Amino acid sequence: MASTELASDVYALPCGDDGTTALSTPVVVSVLASLLERHIARNERDQAAAADGEAARRARAFDSGTVLDMSLHAFLERFSRYANVSPQVYVVAYAYLDRLRRGDGVRVVSANAQRLLTTAILVASKFVEDRNYKNSYFAAVGGLTAAELSSLELDFLFLMQFRLNVSVSVFQSYCRHLEREVSYGGGYQVERCLKKALVCSGEAQAQQRQAASAAAQ
């Protein structure tokens, strides 16, 4: 099936006819869940011996020894349903997870999925959204304690080396990557409407200010 651009703003929560937020799940949740399930299966086949050092210690903090008692799709959906997490946040959270994999070799597996995903979504939400729920609320949605999540957030930030910026071009590249998952994930389509999307790095706002300044001269 050929990919087509839809007129709706995909990177906003679906809305009903009256403009209120609908309860339907953002399509990115389905695509990301499918992608992560394959990552977990591959990572658990290819798990290497644990490394030593500070980064390895922080990475081990995410290992809980237990696995989620629900599907990844249901788990990810909880954050859009109960914490009003926007689809942009899921894209940025996935970008963070990919950086961890490339940098310190931190990979999502069954034993760390709950903690790692909850923390990645929390940090991405703080970067993307103007207003956020408290850590204690996010912790409840993710099935963790507030103290646990706050500690994991700090470990996550150090693993990321506090490099949280996601530029427009990088954001777009991850959108395209998720779109390619359509052929593997059962026909989902990650429609893009980036002009309407929240711009994660603030570059659009900066460009607008520069344009306004130039026009005034």
Swiss-Prot record:
Pfam families per UniProt: Cyclin (PF08613)
Family per similarity comment: Belongs to the cyclin family. Cyclin U/P subfamily.
PANTHER family xref list: CYCLIN-U2-1, PTHR15615
Biological process annotations from GO: cell division
Keywords linked to the UniProt accession: Cell cycle, Cell division, Cyclin
Highest classification ranks of the organism: Eukaryota, Viridiplantae, Streptophyta, Embryophyta, Tracheophyta
Name by which UniProt lists this protein: Cyclin-P2-1
Family annotation (Gene3D superfamilies): Cyclin-like
Coiled coil: none
Gene Ontology MF term list: protein kinase binding
